[in-house]
Amino acid sequence: EQAHIMEDHCIHCGQCLEVCPQNAKTFASDMERVKGYLQRGVRTVLSLAPSYLSVLDFDQPGQVVDALMRLGFDEVRETAEGAALVTEEYQKLLKSGQMTNIISTCCPSINDLIEKYYPSLVPMMAPVVSPMIAHGRLIKQMYGPDVKVVFLGPCIAKKAEAVGDERVEGAINAILTFEEVIRWWREEGIRVEECEDKPMGNPDPGVNRLYPIGGGVITSVLTGGSEDHYEKFHAEGIKTCMELLDELTRGEVKGGFFELNVCKGGCVKGPAAERWKRSMLKARLDLEHQVKYTEEAVHIEHEPILLDKVFEDRYIQDDQPTERELTEVLRAMGKYTRQDELNCGACGYATCRAKAEAVYQGKAEISMCLPHAVAQAESMSNLVMDATPNMVLIVDRDMHIRECNKRMLDKLGISREEALERYIFEFIEVEDIEQVLEDKKSILRKRIQLETLDVIAKETIVYIESVDSALVVYQDVSKEEKAREQHMNLKMETIDIAQKV
């Protein structure tokens, strides 16, 4: 079985990619599509997220431009150019003062989170496209609708926004991550530090390069903006953002402009930038070093661009189990009483009942319950031990019985509790066991006679290094030996009779 993303519930935050040790999920790459554009000679412009300033290694920012153009792109322009357009729209909203609260809509994961899980807050969302979409539309206006626009950045949610949201379809043709481009440079033998310092294809976007860090949107909006009456707040990290959204849902805050980022630290710490392992402080300082806070973007003359976006209620109403259905799931998890509900949190859910509800809704598997899995494993292990016709026990270096199966207990004539307090030498000879524990060499299928148990057996003893003990298995062959003995006696009697005749 494999976990599958429930697209209608997903906010594309990338947490599953970051935390999964098995790398079971990967980012769907557009690399071949982009290479196809370049190989066919299609005019292709790259929209470069300003987070490159804190993620990529270079001596001069222009070296990144040259390295990208060597791959075949016709032009490299900063996404911050689109951010400048978004800043102007935010300033208009603030100046008008018509919205009770304004939530920035630059982060597509935050947009998904609100539309799917906080639909009552949709009216507070700034009705403006993201900087990436604004930039894509600007580039297509400049060069015509046939130009291909490729976005390069650290965010995987941009992919879902560009190709999965019909409201902004067509603005961006492909998405690449920094990791993908670095591999591409390596394949082509391009070393950024050896490249020329080339200028971007766009005018200076000024302070709008700060969008990728926490508070960057607010700083951009305040620079050159007119006075307004909104308090400015910024929050980063999904937990902090959800706490703030909960407060807004309760109506506890009014007259605020809220800049929210799902990624703690902002876009510079996006899921496709984690491999660099830069601290939030270092990433922020690297970017701030390249940006002049007080400079507005150089104005670009262009035809009017559609920057409006209508956000919607996309709330998913999950089926809720009845108390009886919930009880059935809990029983399947091995939770028969309230005392069985350990609420250990190992499955990722706060309580066993929350986990059971998720199982009912198809979001989780019963096997994800760690205590249940351990109990199942122990149950299966005990079943195997008890079902085997052989006598099995584990003995430590002191000859203390550590484990014993039912068949052995029957032969010893004692209970399991009593057996675990006894020594094996009280019942049988232990020379072979001592030898294996001393030499750490196994004995396999040795024929012996356990006189005290009235058993003829084939003995197998294996040393278990992890617990410094011996696994002892006796295969009872008494019946076979007696049958063989009877057959031999019959054979000898037949020979004896024949000789007498």
Tell me the role of every PLM-derived stretch.
Residues A28-Q317, P321-L330, A350-E357:
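Iron-sulfur-associated redox domains of electron-transfer enzymes in respiratory
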Residues Q376-K411:
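Sensory modules in modular signal-transduction proteins
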